[in-house]
UniProtKB/Swiss-Prot annotation:
Disulfide bonds: none annotated. This is Cysteine--tRNA ligase. Monomer. SUPFAM superfamilies: Anticodon-binding domain of a subclass of class I aminoacyl-tRNA synthetases, Nucleotidylyl transferase. Belongs to the class-I aminoacyl-tRNA synthetase family. The lineage of its organism: Bacteria, Bacillati, Chloroflexota, Dehalococcoidia, Dehalococcoidales. Binds 1 zinc ion per subunit. It comes from the Bacteria. Its EC number is 6.1.1.16. It catalyses: tRNA(Cys) + L-cysteine + ATP = L-cysteinyl-tRNA(Cys) + AMP + diphosphate.
Length: 457
C-alpha cells in the first residue's frame, strides 16, 4: 500500500512503526461555531482512511482533538455574553451529532486543549530548559532559528516564510518568526497558573501535547487540511522533536484538499459557509459521502447543488441494491467477487483512490441489478457489495420515518400484499397500495425480477 507523504512530497510504501498497530492523529475543530461541510469533507476522508486500514488488519488508535480555547472563541463568547467554555461545549455537542449523522466512526479519544494544560506546561518548561524557548513578560516563544530542519514540511526556508507571510512586529520576540508556546493573560480571558505567571496555551503546542500524551513520541499518521501545513503542522514538528529528541515525530503526513464555493475556499472568515446541518436537511449522509469520495482526498472540491443532486441519485441507486431481499425462487448466479475485491483494494492501496473504489461499487451494483432483472441473484455478490460500501462508510439505509423508525419492513410487507392481491386478480386494491405509497413518497418499480421501491426526491 502506497500513500502520499507531504513530508517527502512523494508516494511511499506504508510501513507502520510497530507491526500491525497504527497511531493516527487528526487535527480537530476550533468549536467557535457550527461545523460546516468543509469539516465534513475532511473527516469523511480520514474516516475512510481509518476504515480501510482497519479492513487491512491494522489496529488503529485514532485521536482527534478539540481546540476549545483560542482568540476567536474568546471574542465570540464575549460578544454573546457567555463563558468561552460554554460556547465551545455547545458547538462540540453539535459537531459530535453531525459526525454521527454522517456515519463517521468516533475517535478513540477527543482530548480538549483546556484539559491538557499540565502536559502543555511540562513541554514548554522542557523546551526552555533545552534552550529552544524563552520567556518574556509572561509569554513563552520558540526559537525557530535553533530548530534543525525548520520548514521541512512546507518545503520553505525561513527567508521564504518571511517573504510570504505578514509577520507582526513584536518587540518581545528575538526573531520575527518565533511563535508563542504560552501567552500571557489579558483582561477578560481564561487563564491558568504557570511558572511564567497567569496565561493560556498557544495554538500549536496544544496538538503536540495531546499527541504526545495519547500516542507517544512518534506516530504513524498525522492528518489535517492543507491549510494547516504551515504554520500549524510545521510548528508541531518543531516543538515535538525539540522536546522529545525523537525524529521523526510523524512518519506520514496526510493532508486533504479544501472545499471551495465557486473560486473561494469555504471558511468562517469568508462567511460563505454551508453548515453540515443545512446540507443534511437537503441531502442524505450517503450523498455527502459520495460527493466527497468521488475525488481524491488530496484534491480541492467545489461545492455545488448540481454535484450534490447527482450524488444523491447515485446514493439512491446503491440503496436499492442494498435493500434487495433474497428471493428463494430466483436462480443463484455467479459473480466474480474476487475480481471486484481485487479491483477495490488495488485502488485503495494506491493512496486511497476512493473515486475508483466507488466506481467499482457502482459496477458491482449494476451487475447485481442486471442479474435480478433476469430473475437471478448472487448471495456472495450482495454480501461483498455491502462489505465494500461499509468500508467507504455508506450506510445505504433506504428510508426512515420522521420518528427514526425503519420503515423498510413495512413497505416490503405492503409490496408482498400487493403481489398476493394481483395474483388474486384484486387489481383495484393492489393499485390502491401503489397510489398510497406514491402519495407517501415511495415509488414502486415492477420488472421481470420483481418489485423494487425507492424514495422519491
Amino acid at each position: 500500500m502506497k500513500i502520499y507523504n507531504t513530508l517527502s512530497g512523494k508516494l511511499e510504501e506504508f510501513v507502520p512503526l510497530e507491526n500491525d498497530k497504527v497511531k493516527m492523529y487528526v487535527c480537530g475543530i476550533t468549536p467557535q461555531s457550527e461545523p460546516h461541510i468543509g469539516h465534513a469533507m475532511s473527516y469523511i476522508n480520514f474516516d475512510v482512511i481509518r476504515r480501510y486500514l482497519t479492513y487491512k488488519g491494522y489496529r488503529v488508535k485514532y485521536i482527534q482533538n478539540f481546540t476549545d480555547i483560542d482568540d476567536k472563541i474568546i471574542a465570540k463568547a464575549n460578544a454573546q455574553g457567555i463563558e468561552p467554555s460554554t460556547l465551545a461545549e455547545r458547538n462540540i455537542g453539535v459537531f459530535l451529532d453531525a459526525m454521527a449523522a454522517l456515519n463517521i466512526t468516533p475517535a478513540d479519544y477527543y482530548p480538549r486543549a483546556t484539559q491538557e494544560v499540565p502536559k502543555i506546561i511540562e513541554i514548554v518548561s522542557g523546551l526552555i530548559d533545552k534552550g529552544y524557548a524563552y520567556a518574556v513578560d509572561g509569554s513563552v516563544y520558540l526559537r525557530v532559528q535553533k530548530v534543525d530542519g525548520y520548514g521541512k514540511l512546507s518545503h520553505r526556508t525561513l527567508e521564504q516564510m518571511m517573504a510570504g507571510a505578514r509577520v507582526e512586529i513584536d518587540e518581545e520576540k528575538e526573531y520575527p518568526m518565533d511563535f508563542a508556546l504560552w501567552k500571557a493573560t489579558k483582561p477578560g480571558e481564561p487563564s491558568w497558573e504557570s511558572p511564567w505567571g497567569l496565561g493560556r496555551p498557544g495554538w500549536h503546542i496544544e496538538c503536540s501535547a495531546m499527541s504526545l500524551r495519547y500516542l507517544g513520541e512518534q506516530i504513524d499518521i498525522h492528518g489535517g487540511g492543507q491549510d494547516l501545513i504551515f504554520p500549524h503542522h510545521e510548528n508541531e514538528i518543531a516543538q515535538s522533536e525539540c522536546f522529545s529528541g525523537v525524529k521523526p515525530f510523524v512518519k506520514y503526513w496526510l493532508h486533504n484538499g479544501l472545499l471551495k464555493l465557486g473560486e473561494e475556499k469555504m471558511s468562517k472568515s469568508l462567511g460563505n459557509l454551508v453548515t453540515i446541518k443545512e446540507a443534511l436537511s437537503r441531502y442524505s449522509a450517503d450523498a455527502l459521502r459520495i460527493f466527497v469520495l468521488s475525488s481524491s482526498y488530496r484534491n480541492p472540491l467545489t461545492y455545488s447543488e448540481e454535484a450534490l443532486e447527482a450524488a444523491e441519485k447515485g446514493a439512491e441507486r446503491l440503496r436499492q441494491t442494498a435493500a434487495r431481499k433474497d428471493n428463494p425462487q430466483f436462480k443463484e448466479t455467479t459473480v466474480d467477487t474476487k475480481a471486484y475485491r481485487e479491483r477495490f483494494t488495488q485502488y485503495m492501496d494506491n493512496d486511497f483512490n476512493t473515486s475508483a473504489a466507488l466506481a467499482t461499487i457502482f459496477d458491482l451494483s449494476r451487475e447485481l441489478n442486471r442479474i435480478e432483472g433476469e430473475a437471478g441473484k448472487s448471495t456472495d455478490g450482495q454480501k461483498l457489495f455491502k462489505e465494500l460500501a461499509d468500508i467507504l462508510g455508506l450506510s445505504l439505509i433506504v428510508a426512515e420515518s420522521k420518528t427514526g423508525t425503519d420503515v423498510a419492513p413495512f413497505i416490503e410487507l405492503l409490496i408482498e400484499l400487493r403481489k398476493d392481491l394481483r395474483v388474486a386478480k384484486q387489481y383495484q386494491l393492489a393499485d390502491k397500495i401503489r397510489t398510497s405509497l406514491d402519495t407517501a413518497g415511495i415509488l414502486l418499480e415492477d420488472s421481470a425480477g420483481g418489485t423494487v421501491w425507492k424514495v422519491k426526491k
